[in-house]
Amino acid sequence: MTKKRIAIIGAGPSGLAQLRAFQSAAAKGAEIPEIVCFEKQDNWGGLWNYTWRTGLDQYGEPVHGSMYRYLWSNGPKEGLEFADYSFEEHFGKQIASYPPRAVLFDYIEGRVLKAGVRNLIRFSTAVRWVEKAGDKFNVTVCHLPEDRTYTEEFDHVIVCSGHFSTPNVPYFPGFENFKGRVLHAHDFRDALEFKDKDILIVGTSYSAEDIGSQCWKYGCKSVTVSHRTAPMGFNWPDNWQEVPLLQKVEGNTAYFKDGTTKDVDAVILCTGYKHHFPFLPDDLRLKTANRLATADLYKGVAFVREPALFYLGMQDQWFTFNMFDAQAWWVRDVIMGRIALPDQATMEADVIDRVTREDAGEDDYAAIWYQGDYVKELIDETDYPSFDVEGACKAFKEWKGHKKKDIMGFRNNAYKSVITGTMAPMHHTPWKDALDDSLEVYLQN
């Protein structure tokens, strides 16, 4: 009998979780399908694979990365720790709770290096088109260095390309004549560019909070945040203000809905991202808002209208790496015949039920527990190592409280690992004073 062939699109955290899931089954003696992972970048890690580039890459492809220098985790690492590969195992000791970008990339890479899955990835290979042909998928890709296009046949396709790389870019009158710089968070790379400048941030997402904090930390003159519905409401520094929605820009002056104005040197649009899958035809393409209960995905992963197609990591996220693991193990077991999918009507009812339950939640705490329950639900159906999901939810709740108490100091707190039970040490330098975010300096605890 011919082995099934599986195409994984993307080698970021969710794609790497899927590779690890299959490798885990093989390590236990199971016969796994033939796996091919296509990755547009020349290295794994997805968004965590930092690049200085913006706009287009060396091959004329849209730059995938939205990562910037000096980024530190904006949530405790205890909420994302791999159940099968702890921070202590990787670093040989417990580390502080809010690692910088380079530290988290090192951790992500460590697990897949140990698993030995790099040979399953075709790097610098962009997926151009996926179409259903009978009971198979034809996947057309381009090897970018050679500009060579070819098509291969697969039994299943797993989309792991993420949803934080195609920016949502609104227009405001006057942008075309603004004398400063207008950019989306996707193209933000270095807070030092905005030293001694008055910056305007449009949006109240996590990127607004974090990019504003970065610019404050590295010496911008002032931060003004424009909100559409409500301010973030934290206890910001004196040179930080929140105002209603931007209406227009004239010269260097920004005009807001309440009639106030502010002269600014730069506008940073922290206005979110789009689920964007240009390689998929309309009947296979996921169309969903950024929410916990995604549209058209049974158990949050199986595409209802074509259940041989899966999407990983498409939810809005409290949980990240460990949720991708839970999803990847579950998808693996469906493909390997360990879990049977129900009929389409049952899957559609599941989607509706998840949306209804999410909508019934009244606040962020309800959302945290909602997603925690989802992670537990998937883990209970596979052999993924169980871990203290409730403890992770409690860490997220503490994190929310720490941010409310001190938005510029919340990263100075420590939490207990839900995998090993070890308490994280306090970092050797308060976040606002830690200007060197290198791996070597961070690990000097």
From Swiss-Prot:
Pfam families reported in the protein's UniProt record: FMO-like (PF00743)
Enzyme class: oxidoreductase
Residues bound to NADP(+): 72, 74, 204-205, 207, 228, 411
Cofactor dependency: FAD
Similarity comment text for this entry: Belongs to the FMO family.
Its biological purpose: Catalyzes the oxidation of trimethylamine (TMA) to produce trimethylamine N-oxide (TMAO). In vitro, has a broad substrate specificity, oxidizing many nitrogen- and sulfur-containing compounds, including dimethylamine (DMA), dimethylsulfide (DMS) and dimethylsulfoxide (DMSO).
Protein name (record): Trimethylamine monooxygenase
Lineage, broadest ranks: Bacteria, Pseudomonadati, Pseudomonadota, Alphaproteobacteria, Rhodobacterales
Gene name for this UniProt entry: tmm
